[in-house]
Amino acid sequence: MKREARNYIDNKLKPPKAFFDWCFSQIPTYKWSNKKETILASNRKNCSVIEQKLRKNSRLTFFGKLNVFGIVLVTSKRIEIQSYAFWNRVVEGKEMIEFDLVNFEQFADGEHVKVAISDGKMWFGLIPIYGGMSGGPYSMIRLFENDWKEKIRSKSELKYLEIPHLDFKEIETIYKYRVEIEFLQKIKARQLSKEVMYPVTQYTNGSFRKTVDMRTINAKWLKENKPFFKNSDRGFMEFELARRIQKRRGKVVSGIEKYLDYRAINKIPEGVGIVRFQNWIIKNKVDFSYYLDYLNLMRDLNIAIDSENIIMPKNLVIAHDNAVKLLYQMKHEVEEQQYKMRFEKIKDLEKTIDNYAFIVPKQASDLLTEGKALSHCVGGSNYIKQHIEGKTTIIFVRDKQYLEKSLYTLEYKNGQIYQLRGKHNCEPTHDVQEAANNWAASVKSKTKVLQHS
């Protein structure tokens, strides 16, 4: 039963004097001297000394570096991780060091308790002790070298486990799953016991995944699946892959683990045999994330995913590219239908002023062509969308003798010429700007005329 946070601290294990002696030995002291005088910040021994020349402007008052030291203490009933922060400063050449327990962890009686301490207050959890909120509780800790590893292996609650290597940050996981680990080690499930003891996140088939899902593994699961793992090097992902494929009335095809993990099986369409699908994946070296994108394209196109030629195209890349083109074409057709009404409203903006023709785009896709021809952004989807919706108006400015050749693009917005740009966003010439100003005046709008700079 969990007690008050203070109760855990009041009854914590007592670190040996050797630990605190070691902590102080890790903190350097200071010495300033010249021919006439020597100033020692402290008389501490067994620590490094930072020596500096004593001058009139020597800085003798300052804050030193924050140091954080930790110790792991072990008895037959408890494992504790205690972290102490040491603050040192020098005032007028005299050293002052203060320290306090800041983080505490205890593993006992099947419970893992974390307590943080600051300014005499205590609460459950851990606090960052260096570098602000980004530091973390152990970001810069230095751990005292005692015999804690041997004691964990020989006298703690974990003494029944085979622990090949041990870092203090691994204690939490090993303690939490000690029952499962002990069971797996007893049946010689070598790979799975390692995965539970030392969980790894690895990059698999386009995403980062943990190699074992501890939400699944419990006493009942272990008992049911003991025959699969006993005396083997089989891991969790191998087991789950086989189990889920068997649910699809199939068996694992050798080599499929390079392309699929077990989480992919439920995403495979039902209209195909699972063994046949695995062979197709392996033969074509299919990137499954790319395949899922292909399936999403099929759904966007409202194409039923219920036949082999759709589920397993002969050439996935070509099928994917064709789907992209078809989807774009459908989207393009919708845009063009929307633009017809808009065009009818603005077609009267077409005029010829002096040597220049001001042309309203006949199709929404004309903006894409214009943007490519002049190497500017008017062909972007945002401009096309705003032009269709009437939030802005795009006008092509052409030499009246060469109407098919892109020259300048004018954006008319909020009753004024918003911008007028040529190739690579170049400024218009004086005569083009003057013609544009006259065009703006001729459309009988309250137009703010831009002056050519």
Curated annotation (Swiss-Prot):
InterPro entries referenced in this protein's UniProt entry, alphabetically: PcfJ
Record family assignment: To S.faecalis plasmid PAM373 EP0012.
Protein name: Uncharacterized protein Lin1253/Lin1744
